């Protein structure tokens, strides 16, 4: 498989804190890679560093063969990277339509692109002229993701999209991500919900204390409860 994203020896410091400590991994084109770990392991920090929100102190980050560790966030976005932060990235006072128009940096939204988005998120078509602040939590998350894919993306970085959502909404989001994946998207996804991770992931990376401590196939981790407990602190009750 073609390597789309790679990190080699990446360290990130925020003030006196050594957040990422020699992170090495790659993401293959067309794959969904889950980035798992306990709270504070460095998962969100990894996404922020890739996206240029935090600067790597040491190391190399490459996107499709191009070095980006010193690039600004807008430049990384222009290279085709979409980012969905943990806090839903929507403008509450604007309509769904206005939110998507603002996200389309390369020009007006055409009907073909809109129908492509509505294919993932039909609810957004129903609430096209509604203020984003009036949407439910699940609908806001859908809008946040739609903003990230309103333009063609090489890579999607998504941070805990199911956090705080009701189980029924989580199932709906999993179906949306599965469709995005079927259409060939490359995704690096941070997720605490192991059910969602198991359903979506092709490969998995586990972080602890700013380092990658496990890498492998998601199916292998999903079938090994003892390994889940050791790496993630999951208990048997988690699976019942």
Where are these regions (language model features)?
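The feature captures the beta-strand-to-loop junction immediately N-terminal to the Walker
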Residues: 36-38
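Helix-to-loop junction immediately C-terminal to a conserved catalytic motif
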Residues: 51
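ABC ATPase NBD coupling module
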Residues: 55, 67-88, 114, 126-129, ...
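Conserved ABC ATPase signature
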Residues: 131-135
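A short, proline-enriched helix->beta-strand linker immediately N-terminal to the Walker B motif
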Residues: 150-154
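Catalytic Walker B motif of ABC-type/P-loop ATPase nucleotide-binding domains
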Residues: 156-160
């Amino acid at each position: 498989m073609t390597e789309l994203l790679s990190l080699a020896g990446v360290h990130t410091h925020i003030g006196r804190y050594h957040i990422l400590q020699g992170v090495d991994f790659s993401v293959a084109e067309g794959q969904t890679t889950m980035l798992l770990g306990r709270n504070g392991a460095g998962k969100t920090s990894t996404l922020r560093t890739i996206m240029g929100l935090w600067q790597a102190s040491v190391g190399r980050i490459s996107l499709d063969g191009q070095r980006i560790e010193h690039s600004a966030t807008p430049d990384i976005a222009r290279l085709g990277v979409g980012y969905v932060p943990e806090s839903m990235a929507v403008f509450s006072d604007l309509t769904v339509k206005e939110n998507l128009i603002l996200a389309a940096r390369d020009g007006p939204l055409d009907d073909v692109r809109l129908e492509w988005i509505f294919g993932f998120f039909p609810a957004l078509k129903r609430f096209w002229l509604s203020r984003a602040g009036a949407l439910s939590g699940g609908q806001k998350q859908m809008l946040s993701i739609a903003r990230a894919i309103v333009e063609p993306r090489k890579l999607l970085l998504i941070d805990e999209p199911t956090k705080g959502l009701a189980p029924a909404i989580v199932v709906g989001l999993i179906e949306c991500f599965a469709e995005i994946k079927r259409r060939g998207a490359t995704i690096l996804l941070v997720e605490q919900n192991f059910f969602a991770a198991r359903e979506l992931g092709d490969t998995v990376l586990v972080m602890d204390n700013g380092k990658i401590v496990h890498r492998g196939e998601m199916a292998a981790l999903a079938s090994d409860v003892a390994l889940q407990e050791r790496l993630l602190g999951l208990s048997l009750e988690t699976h019942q």
